[in-house]
Amino acid sequence: MALYRAPKLQRSLLNRCLATASTTPAAASTSRTSTFRKTLEEGPTLDDFIAGDVPNNRVVLGNTSAPRLPSYLKTSIPTGASFSKIKKDLRGLNLHTVCEEARCPNIGDCWGGKPGATEAEGRSAATATIMLMGDTCTRGCRFCSVKTSRTPPPLDPHEPENTAEAISRWGLGYIVLTSVDRDDLADGGARHFAETISKIKQKAPHILVEALTGDFAGNLEHVSLVAKSGLDVYAHNIETVEALTPFVRDRRATFRQSLSVLKRAKEEGVKVTKTSIMLGVGETEDQVLDALKELRKVDVDVVTFGQYMRPTKRHMKVDRYVEPAEFDRWKQVAEDLGFLYVASGPLVRSSYKAGEFYIENVLKGKSVNKRVKNLTMESELSEKSASASL
């Protein structure tokens, strides 16, 4: 009898061992996976680890030190006949705008044209910013979300002709051309830029062209090449104050180098030069004022102020959200310093309603009158000062 029970008992023990061996690791694995997933969800973020200020005995959810987004920085969904028409045209003309790709909050204002205008009138008063030379930059500024590479794709030799043809058929009265930095090219893309502008002017002389360029690695001959291509406005952004430039912009960009670009453009006979400053990155009032004075020394005509908005968590944090009243104050300060036109507000960007400014202020002569008025006031103050000293 024992001879028959032994195999049965052995089989029972073997089955029990196999069952235990097959279920225990799976159960343990599931438990470990759940614990790991829970730790990832509730644990510190990458920013917390980089900062190194998270205590070992507690978990911090998110970035508690970051300022909350104010309500005045939230915008409504853009609408309107002019906006819809321009968006539809873009698809058919195969043009790429910074307005859409950067999700600019002012797209409704710039593409919407004037209130109450017809579709054609709205389109002629609208402003759009076209990106040239690809979508990959050779620089890596800490505020910018454009992708970067040391070896971006080669230029499209047909882009100047195709862009000019598309823009001439588009019907806009004002166009802004910009590009990524191309330090991989011998001329930084200056000839490509200049050729595009020249072809636009050949096909549609009535279209006003603003070129928002990089610094061409400080090569002023390349700046001159673009400045003499037939454009109406030369723009180059200093982005921030001099003291913060090394921490905000790519190491190859300097404040003084940017000033030299704007100075050379004016020396080449460009009527209007323009730049832009982000606020909320840690600047002081004295630093902003000094930057404005330096810009006036090189005869910059237009300046815009806007709030820095963090594109992703990989980019530098917002130091603070600047109140609208402070933007209004900087507008007044800049105008008092002699700038022809100042656009200042939390949502303002470099090309904010650029066409409206140019048409209303430059072509109608308002800028000339304002410049004469400022010079007259300066002359009167000088005379009073001289009389007082006597």
Curated annotation (Swiss-Prot):
Binds 2 [4Fe-4S] clusters per subunit. One cluster is coordinated with 3 cysteines and an exchangeable S-adenosyl-L-methionine. Pathway: Protein modification; protein lipoylation via endogenous pathway; protein N(6)-(lipoyl)lysine from octanoyl-[acyl-carrier-protein]: step 2/2. Residues 1-18 form a transit peptide. It catalyses: [[Fe-S] cluster scaffold protein carrying a second [4Fe-4S](2+) cluster] + N(6)-octanoyl-L-lysyl-[protein] + 2 oxidized [2Fe-2S]-[ferredoxin] + 2 S-adenosyl-L-methionine + 4 H(+) = [[Fe-S] cluster scaffold protein] + N(6)-[(R)-dihydrolipoyl]-L-lysyl-[protein] + 4 Fe(3+) + 2 hydrogen sulfide + 2 5'-deoxyadenosine + 2 L-methionine + 2 reduced [2Fe-2S]-[ferredoxin]. It is found in: Mitochondrion. Residues 120-340 form the Radical SAM core domain. GO terms for cellular component: mitochondrion. The keyword Disulfide bond does not apply. The keyword Metal-binding applies. Its EC number is 2.8.1.8. [4Fe-4S] cluster 1 binds at residues 99, 104, 110, 351. [4Fe-4S] cluster 2 binds at residues 137, 141, 144. PANTHER family: LIPOYL SYNTHASE (PTHR10949), LIPOYL SYNTHASE, MITOCHONDRIAL (PTHR10949:SF0). Belongs to the radical SAM superfamily. Lipoyl synthase family. This is Lipoyl synthase, mitochondrial. It comes from Coprinopsis cinerea (strain Okayama-7 / 130 / ATCC MYA-4618 / FGSC 9003).
